[in-house]
């Protein structure tokens, strides 16, 4: 009974790890498309860095506060730099 339970839990853990690794590879393959040279990827990274580090310089309109730009599309803002999630 214990051996069966351990085997089932081990298989479940391997399946979860395999699925996570497959998702990461799929995301990387989408970024590294054949038609997209490294210079374009660098431009995307610079753009994301800019998006995250720009503070709000627009004056308030009425009662609305302006908002900082945020990182999007699988990136998060950390220490004013967009990093891949």
Swiss-Prot record:
InterPro entries reported for this sequence: Hwtx-2-like
Tissue expression: Expressed by the venom gland.
Record's protein name: U4-theraphotoxin-Hhn1s
Pfam families, A to Z: Toxin_20
Species annotation: Cyriopagopus hainanus (Chinese bird spider)
Assigned keywords, A-Z: Disulfide bond, Neurotoxin, Postsynaptic neurotoxin, Secreted, Signal, Toxin
Secreted in keyword set: yes
Signal peptide boundaries: 1-22
Pro-sequence residue ranges: 23-48
Lineage: Eukaryota, Metazoa, Ecdysozoa, Arthropoda, Chelicerata
GO molecular function, one term: toxin activity
S-S pairs: 52-66, 56-77, 71-82
GO cellular component: extracellular region; host cell postsynaptic membrane
